[in-house]
């Protein structure tokens, strides 16, 4: 446990943030605010002002001095934050331009763009121009990178003037804004900073690409670009734009995309020149480049033959492991012909990624494939493609329907789908009756998100009338005024408003915004089906059977098939699935008739069917299906002069609760129908495994037929049902749900775009919390493929601009890295190596621990806005909660006081979804944290609770160490992180979901969950248990009765003496969720007792529950330790005498009882 690592990190981080400050401001002055120990508390005061350089030298002198490492750490921890005074407020944009010029000059002294790079860029530019000319018919005006003045001149209808010249509106131009949590010039300055500190490590190819990308950035920067400022105003007025002859439409996006390519230049392995090609092509065809540059991967994954190993798996979704024997390679002539045919027609022949693919078909090394795969991931980083909602939705729902279809196949499809739904719905109605006494109001409304209800209306909120689109407020309004809200069909027939979703490399998609009634009716049906699918109720057919518990190796069966190459793997992609003919009348009538038939099957009568707010769920479901079969979509483009569009639509509505699970059912029915018909003509086909996930599907089968015959026949069968499909077949590789499985290895693409976002960041979040989620995404990209260098570069880009908080116009506070990497409104809530939660302190000194606790906790501030309390006493809120409480009492057949209190608390929190309330909460929190910072002298009380790493250090101080045996193993689930690989080699890989040591059973929680219609968390139980006197029998009994437990269950539970055991488990429930190891690559680790015992061997006489908690705490600290230091060890703790043992046990139990666990934004359930 070397504190040297921690010291080096802390010093480097402080220095980095300081040197960035001196780079982007002219002559700033800085002063340390230092903490002084004052027995009970710490006292903060400000020291004298210096230049950043002087301060950097001061920190450097501490690190180099002869005092002990612990004393050095103490000196740096005492820096609470650094005040930065900026007198010269000259425009930062000018400073950035000077930096750009200096950087380009510096690179030009070392290299120039070679002919090879020049040819690559020119070739792809010409190809992009040709493609643009050939496809110009399908282009909208905003797909061209043209002058903004020209665009406005010929498309006046796309802009709306505002009262303020800088507050004009335009959906289309706003879609071209990259949406990043800093201004564009700040991004450029942080990229320049991060490259300048690595300047001497670049090779010649990297320098050439840097030269090209920085030149592109400079050209666009000098010409000017349009951006939305933090105060939601535009940077230019329309009058300026009409005159301006240099600002191009895509300038800002090209700058952000170039910055993204500079970051991926640090990925290993990658083709550097291809990154330059991406930008060259993107500059010509900004809306289409990502899609067309990435498309060859779909075919390549099916034909590339990797050097790998055979994988064996059982039929259980999550069991698979690689063996020693090499995988089997198999490629048919027809596949090669298809690939060559496609590639000869591919419009971007000069793409270096495609050239690498063509050279690497047979016997490809994993490294080579990784390089190609990283190039593929890089194409998505040009950012989100955003079209005008009207154009996009119109294109999305255009489908030719025909009566010339195979009637017999349609009947088969319809009966299959109906039969599946009938069985499920019959089971559903009975379960709701036996479980909730048929009243599902509480469950449905508790799960309702406070999203848009589609249209705006006036409602009373506290003392004012507000116009709002929020579902919750509409619901409260309906209930409190006793309005008739049951005629759902009529409501839908008036028209369905549309929202949109944007993703990189795909066209904008429409989302149906259905009213709250639809969500309330469909919730329990969807939940029932999902739960069943998750339990594997439909075999391993549904992707939902593959939950986080085993998300790592769910694809085991497919990994096995691709490594043995003995089955044909077929993946079909139905274009425009939602609007396809089989999803119109057949899909809706299958639902309607399934409900009618289910009613003849179950043993309950009509009055016992589930109801929500007095509406019969099944009746209303029929009404919704009938209304949606023939609906009108209303598509508005409010930031333009376009008229609202009404489009007739008959397909599936993405926006229903049942959309995804319903699609999965329809998909199973569709594939089954196709294969039933196929076996008539191809009797040798034997389907082995089928998997659907919404509209995605994969089938593996044994067949004696040729691969091209099977493909042609499949296409023909789909055609007879009027479904346009791409049927891709292969023996060795496939793509499913954004994962790529090839020759027994599973790759995930690192395609999370960091410098652009789908929507603008809310003004209510602090820059630190948005930066935290960006670091998290960058870590996921790094783990998946880009590697550790990329993550280091990204932290250097993301952290320095977000490390300071503005206090006044001229004063900023540069926070200590310790505060930044902890939890709270001004923190990232993530560690520098990408795990969710707080950065750990790896130091053994008690004094340092005290200082560290102060720095991490003094800004963890939570504020409850007054509006929440006020709204909870209004008649509107009561109307909703009273209905929900009576529903809980009907369902639980008891008063269930605690459950109803928890319900009230949870409903109160939903008021945060009301516009401005969340904003107020976050702003108050940030304001309070700022005030805490701006007091030059203040007293901070010491933290009395223990941090988990204190237990870790305690055990290590009493242990002996050995070097662990790391098993070299063949990866099935690929990652590109040295430290994760080390952890996998020591702890093993999660291979099965069967033999884990399960979390200890919390009987109390199980009993409550069995009866309660709303979700109850373990922390709720702990909170409410404090309100009862649990020392005597009556107190215990009352506590259990108020939880809704009665009769025999109450008697048995009281006799079992389990109450305190269960409350202890509830208190530490967070330990059983992996604390923010949300990256799937980390889920490949079996974080359980067995793994903990591979690292720690502890012989202390602890009660069993405490032993488990101790081991889990130690294991999580160990994961943090390895991810930070890269060192592994094995620790043995055997106390020498009984006295020492007793002392240690007492200390450990006290620490566990008073532990302070993180509350984290990012978390994943592990069990």
Swiss-Prot record:
EC number: 2.7.7.48
Disulfide bonds: none
Keywords: Nucleotide-binding, Nucleotidyltransferase, RNA-binding, RNA-directed RNA polymerase, Transferase, Viral RNA replication, Virion
Gene Ontology CC annotation, any one: virion component
Gene Ontology MF annotations: nucleotide binding; RNA binding; RNA-directed RNA polymerase activity
RdRp catalytic domain boundaries: 553-735
Localisation: Virion
InterPro entries recorded: DNA/RNA_pol_sf, RNA-dir_pol_luteovirus, RNA-dir_pol_reovirus
Catalysed reactions, semicolon-separated: RNA(n) + a ribonucleoside 5'-triphosphate = RNA(n+1) + diphosphate
Family: Belongs to the reoviridae RNA-directed RNA polymerase family.
Protein name stated in the entry: RNA-directed RNA polymerase
